[in-house]
Structure formats: C-alpha cells, structure tokens
C-alpha cells in the first residue's frame, strides 16, 4: 500500500504517524511518503505559540470538541514523560479576560482548575471586568514538528520537498491513498470556497519574567484581534492580529505597532522586553474542519483521498483527535479493499 501525505505541518505529520502506528503491523508493505514545499521551520505550525485552547463558542460540529478533548488527554498523558522537553510540551496557567461576563466554555472541565477570577485578580487588569483562570498545556510547534519528523524517519517514512500541482499528478505516480493536509493552500489542489486565510502576525520577545498566558477577548473586534501574551520555553509570543482573506506574508509595521502597544498596555513590564523576531502566518479558516474521504477518478481507476484541513487557529489544539479520525478513515479503505484485518482498537 502506497500512501502519500501532502503537507508537513502538525496535521500532516501527526496523521502520517497515526496511520503508520496503527497499520504497519497488519499491512505490509506500508509505504508512506510526505510531500511538502515547506518543512519546519517554515510552516504555519512553526508560527503558532502552541497554547491548547479551542474557540470559546461551541463548534457547529460537536465532533470537533471531541477531537480537541482527545488531543488534550493525549498531551496530558505525555506531559511528565521523559520526551516532554523534546516535544516542547509543558503545563502553563493563565488568564482569559473579558469586558463583561460570558458563559463558561464547553471545555472548562477539560482543562485543569478552571475558575472565575476574583475581584483582586481583576484589579491587575483595569481594562477588563471579568475573566477565568485555569491550567492548560503548551505544545511548541517547532519542537513538536522535529520530534514527529524523527519518529516518522525511524519508521521508514520518506520526506520529499516538492510542490504538488494536483492529486492526479500523485495518483499517476502510483499512490493508492492520498492524505490531503495542505492547510490554507488546499484550495490550490481542489477548489474550496469555504476556505480562507486568516492572516496573523506575532512577535517573539525575551521576557523570562512572564510565567502566565494572558488572552483578551473583544466581541467587537472578533477572535484573535485583541492582545494576547503566551510564554514559551525560550521566548514569549505577543499577538493580536487576525485578517480574513489577507494573503500578505510581509510583516506589517501597523500590525507591529498594534501588537506592541496592546500587549504593553496589558502587561506594562513588556516595555523592557527585547524583541527577538517577528513572523507572519496564515490560519486555514473554514466554518468546519474538512475531514472526510473522497474517491477521485484518475485514469482507469479511482484514487482514495482523505482530506484533513481547515483547522483555523487551533491546529495544535485539535491535531491528535483529527489524526486518529483520519487513521480510522484509512482503516475503512483497507476494509473495503480487503487488504487487512482491522487491528484491535487502541487509539
């Protein structure tokens, strides 16, 4: 069985790993290749701060909440493992701030120690009148992609830097199954009017005194368009930019000023922080994640395609649950082709 995964961000690499872990012992040979024109450190995943937090509003598809829950549980089970440092995985506590009271999020029982802020805590944030505190997880994308790459390499998965122009091109080369994890660029392979770029710009600063994440929310501005501060192992990520439909990869001075001024107002000690770097990336925004099978007619036969893209700004938050689901879809293909008996479920 020849499988090609297109895309080398967190969605592509985690999906490749799930498929190989589940089926390599019952399907031999299982030949998996990863094609991408961008690898770490140039992927969208590399730009992300990596804080586990779904959108505040409940998704229309309740399964997305399940996938996020599965991802949190998976990461929490590894947070004290010897590999946690290599994964870029650690626990972190922090604040979500609002101008007025809102309902608790659907994931309040998933994170640890969720509670409302006390009046004394709110005194630290004079621009906000309501908030939450809880402990979550950070999974730093750059570390995690390197770890996934190493695990896949150990398993014999091959990586090729190339720009795929069409599914037909890959099918003609002999792929039995194509896994489409191309993120915001999925529309180049198959038209998808629901998919749009959600441009973000972030700054990395040296501020080792920052120990808690601080996310602010402004309904009038919309998601990701108000300041946020997320500490990592080496640097602190500052952000607050979300521009739907903007394809510019250039760092913008106006956005730079918006981020810097907003975050320094939120946490005045950041005025003393040294700016390390600045990055721009595109969140693959879609009303719902596209995670489904499709049969494409390629010449005399059909080629199976598994689509797994459209994860917006929460790819690291939901990736493992989606990878498990994609692996299940792969298993159904094998069942229909009668190529393998299904292994016992341990996902």
From Swiss-Prot:
Mutagenesis / variant outcome for changing residue 31 to H: Increases affinity for the FAD cofactor and D-serine. Decreases the cellular ratio of D-serine to L-serine
Localization per record: Peroxisome matrix; Cytoplasm, Cytosol; Presynaptic active zone; Secreted
Tissue localization of expression: Expressed in the cerebellum, in astrocytes of the cortex, in motor neurons and fibers of the lumbar spinal cord (at protein level). Expressed in goblet cells of the small intestine (at protein level). Increased in the cerebellum of schizophrenic patients (at protein level). Decreased in motor neurons of the spinal cord of patients with amyotrophic lateral sclerosis (at protein level). Expressed in the cerebellum, spinal cord, kidney, and thalamus. Abundant in glia of the cerebellum and predominantly neuronal in the dorsolateral prefrontal cortex, hippocampus and substantia nigra.
InterPro entries: D-amino_acid_oxidase_CS, DAO, FAD-dep_OxRdtase
GO terms for cellular component: cell projection; cytoplasm; cytosol; extracellular space; peroxisomal matrix; presynaptic active zone
Ways its activity is controlled: Inhibited by benzoate, crotonate, thiolactomycin, chlorpromazine (CPZ), risperidone, haloperidol, sulpiride, aripiprazole, blonanserin, quetiapine, 4H-furo[3,2-b]pyrrole-5-carboxylic acid, and the substrate analog CF3-D-ala (3,3,3-trifluoro-D-alanine). Inhibited by luvadaxistat, and 6-chloro-1,2-benzisoxazol-3(2H)-one (CBIO).
Motif Microbody targeting signal mapped to chain: 345-347
Outcome of swapping residue 331 to V: Leads to the formation of ubiquitinated protein aggregates; impairs targeting to peroxisomes; results in abnormal peroxisomal morphology; decreases cell viability
Entry's EC annotation: 1.4.3.3
Inducing or repressing factors: Induced in cells following exposure to etoposide.
GO terms (BP aspect): D-alanine catabolic process; D-amino acid catabolic process; D-serine catabolic process; D-serine metabolic process; digestion; dopamine biosynthetic process; L-leucine metabolic process; neutrophil-mediated killing of gram-negative bacterium
Secreted as UniProt keyword: yes
Catalytic activity: a D-alpha-amino acid + O2 + H2O = a 2-oxocarboxylate + H2O2 + NH4(+); D-alanine + O2 + H2O = pyruvate + H2O2 + NH4(+); D-cysteine + O2 + H2O = 2-oxo-3-sulfanylpropanoate + H2O2 + NH4(+); D-dopa + O2 + H2O = 3-(3,4-dihydroxyphenyl)pyruvate + H2O2 + NH4(+)
Residues involved in D-proline binding: 228, 283, 313
Temperature dependence: Optimum temperature is 45 degrees Celsius.
Alphabetized GO MF terms: D-amino-acid dehydrogenase activity; D-amino-acid oxidase activity; FAD binding; glycine oxidase activity; identical protein binding
Modification comment: Phosphorylated in the cerebellum; probably not by PRKACA, PRKCA or PRKCE. May be S-nitrosylated, which partially inactivates the enzyme.
Known function: Catalyzes the oxidative deamination of D-amino acids with broad substrate specificity. Required to catabolize D-amino acids synthesized endogenously, of gastrointestinal bacterial origin or obtained from the diet, and to use these as nutrients. Regulates the level of D-amino acid neurotransmitters in the brain, such as D-serine, a co-agonist of N-methyl D-aspartate (NMDA) receptors, and may modulate synaptic transmission. Catalyzes the first step of the racemization of D-DOPA to L-DOPA, for possible use in an alternative dopamine biosynthesis pathway.
Disease affiliated with this protein: Schizophrenia: A complex, multifactorial psychotic disorder or group of disorders characterized by disturbances in the form and content of thought (e.g. delusions, hallucinations), in mood (e.g. inappropriate affect), in sense of self and relationship to the external world (e.g. loss of ego boundaries, withdrawal), and in behavior (e.g bizarre or apparently purposeless behavior). Although it affects emotions, it is distinguished from mood disorders in which such disturbances are primary.
Quaternary organization: Homodimer. Interacts with DAOA; the interaction is direct, can occur in the presence or absence of FAD or substrate bound to DAO, and results in a complex containing two DAO homodimers and 2 DAOA monomers. Interacts with BSN (via coiled region); the interaction is direct and inhibits DAO enzyme activity.
Similarity section: Belongs to the DAMOX/DASOX family.
Protein's name according to its UniProt entry: D-amino-acid oxidase
Natural source organism: Homo sapiens (Human)
């Amino acid at each position: 069985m020849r499988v090609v995964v297109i895309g080398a961000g967190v969605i592509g690499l985690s999906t490749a790993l799930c498929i190989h872990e589940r089926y390599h012992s019952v399907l031999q040979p299982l030949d998996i290749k990863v094609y991408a024109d961008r690898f770490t450190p140039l992927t969208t995943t590399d730009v992300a701060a990596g804080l586990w937090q779904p959108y505040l509003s409940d998704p229309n598809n309740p399964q997305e909440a399940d996938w996020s829950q599965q991802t949190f549980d998976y990461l929490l089970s590894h947070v004290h493992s010897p590999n946690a440092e290599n994964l870029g995985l650690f626990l972190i506590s922090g604040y979500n701030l609002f101008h007025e009271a809102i309902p608790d999020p659907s994931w309040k029982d998933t994170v640890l120690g969720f509670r409302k802020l006390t009046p004394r805590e709110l005194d630290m944030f004079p621009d906000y009148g309501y908030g939450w505190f809880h402990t979550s997880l950070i999974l730093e994308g750059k570390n995690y992609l390197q770890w996934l790459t190493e695990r896949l390499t150990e398993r014999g998965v091959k990586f090729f830097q190339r720009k795929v122009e069409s599914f037909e091109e890959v099918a003609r080369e002999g792929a039995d199954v194509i896994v489409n994890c191309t993120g915001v660029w999925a529309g180049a392979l198959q038209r998808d009017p629901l998919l749009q770029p959600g441009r973000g710009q972030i700054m990395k600063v040296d501020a080792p005194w920052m120990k808690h994440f601080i996310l602010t929310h402004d309904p009038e501005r919309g998601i990701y368009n108000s300041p946020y501060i997320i500490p990592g192992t080496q640097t602190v990520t500052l952000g607050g930019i979300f521009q739907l439909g903007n394809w510019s990869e250039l760092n913008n001075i106006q956005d730079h000023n918006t981020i810097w001024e907003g975050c320094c107002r939120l946490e005045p000690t950041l005025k003393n922080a040294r700016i390390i770097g600045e990055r721009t990336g595109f969140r693959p925004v879609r009303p719902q994640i596209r995670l489904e099978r499709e049969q494409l007619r390629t010449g005399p036969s059909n080629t199976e395609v598994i689509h797994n893209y459209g994860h917006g700004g929460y790819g690291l938050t939901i990736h493992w649950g989606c990878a498990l689901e994609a692996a299940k879809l792969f298993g159904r293909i094998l069942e229909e082709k009668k190529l393998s008996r299904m292994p016992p479920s341990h996902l």
